Amino acid sequence: MGLLRVAFFAAHFAIGLGLPAASQDVTLTSRDGKISISGRLLTYDGEFFRIDSEFGALTLDGSGVTCAGVGCPDLQGFVAEFTIAGSKTMGDVLLPALIESFADQSSMTLQRIVTDDAHFTYVLSLPDTGRAVAKIGFRLSNTDGGFADMMAGQADMVLATREVTEAEASAAKEAKLGDMTQPARSRIVGLDGVVSVVAPNNPVRAVSLDDLARLFAGQIANWQEIGGPDAPVYLHMMAADSGLAQQFMRKVMGRSDLQLSENVMRHGTAAELVDAVAKDPFAIGISRFSDLGNARRVALHGACGMDFAATRQSLKTEDYPLAMPLFLYTPARRLPKTAREFLAFLRSPAAQRVVRHVGFVDQQVGEVGIERQGQRLANAIALAGEETPLDELQRMVTVLRPAKRLTVTFRFETGSTRLDAQSRGNVILLARLLEAGYFGGRELMFVGFSDGEGDAAVNRKIAKRRAAAVRTAVTNVATTLKPSELSLSIEGFGEALPMACDDSDWGRGINRRVEVWVK
């Protein structure tokens, strides 16, 4: 009722000034009949009215007012309506599957009304009466189109395979949709990854990020240059406005400051791309982890001998450097109750099972024992510098041996202390698990690691400070967590457990991280 009181105060104050009344389509009157506000009805979500009045946009609790006028909704037969726009990658299968599961969990029947492949509507109804409760419309194109639809007032949620751009965030602010860069404006529905793919009979098993960029810039034109046969390289890529292509340009080509070759063959869908690559032993394409078809993924190779394969675990932990979170963005306005319930459902275990079932990577938190991390420990010993003595490695193993690593990991944006998008989502994910008592009676250790640049002792201190900062970020979100319910400790091992070589920005970025261990 706070907004209602504010609205009534504004109305009372303005009426006292004798402001002229305008022709409006609804009038909302308090239950005692003492105060009325007229305006153009913007939305009604089944609970709250939002009107454009002479005092600006006001939101009023429907339980405290009566509505009169031609614009008043049917309160008894109200049907919540909202539209989801954006990436076909997410909208073709993933979101429909999630809506079907949501309807089942909510004991509602579901009907799909199709206009065409990109435009369709789901109608959720009560099973006993058949009365429609909600209509969820879809406008599928790509991430760019989804944000454009939201700016134009044609969408309430945006499906995005990349983060919002500065230009889009600025336009959203101008449109009074809120700050799209803030965590509250987006959530990660699931995970995917940018992967390079080749035909099954291509002998190349791994390629460095630098060579991958040079391949797609046309600087490497023969497979022989990267250990393959003496044959020309044929390049395949998705359409330039696809989220996948944009991610590749930012994370791979942008880091190398290279331009894409004009000889790249473009494809409208990932299925078409992997099919073309699988049939050509001399082709290489950029696809998604979730779209492999008959092609074979190529691992990323580090200069110091470490390879990074895209797996469900490495995408969850971001140990694979080209992880691709799947975002759902919402504006800073109140959505219908059914929409809010659907958003809450997306964080449930049931939703994450759906994400995995349809081929994407879920965010269910797993535990990895140290016995399954032999390669990491071997790398730590092999790459340990002079400033990482044996006793420090022994201390690390002693601390971590009785614990298990969670697949929740925290990494930072390039050249910044700000957590990257997936890690910001992990803050909320871990906080919700803590509040739910998921780790009750156990100890969580936030363990910081660094790259190998600079003094080792200083790096250990920096790593420990990062671990403390991440712990604070998580506990600030987990507002219902009582300190007595769980032990949350911090530790810093600096450069003692490298995940990648320090000879590149992306390698150093992988090494600068905070892991979470539980025992």
Predicted regions and their residues:
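N-terminal hydrophobic targeting signals that begin at the initiator methionine
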Residues: 1-2
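Bacterial N-terminal signal peptides
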Residues: 5-18
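Signal peptide processing junction and immediate N-terminal pro/mature segment
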Residues: 20-22
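Exported/periplasmic ABC-transporter solute-binding proteins
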Residues: 25-439, 464, 468, 472, ...
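Periplasmic OmpA-like peptidoglycan-binding domain that tethers envelope proteins to the cell wall
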Residues: 140, 145, 449-519
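Short loop/turn segments at strand-loop or loop-helix junctions that form parts
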Residues: 412-413, 446-451
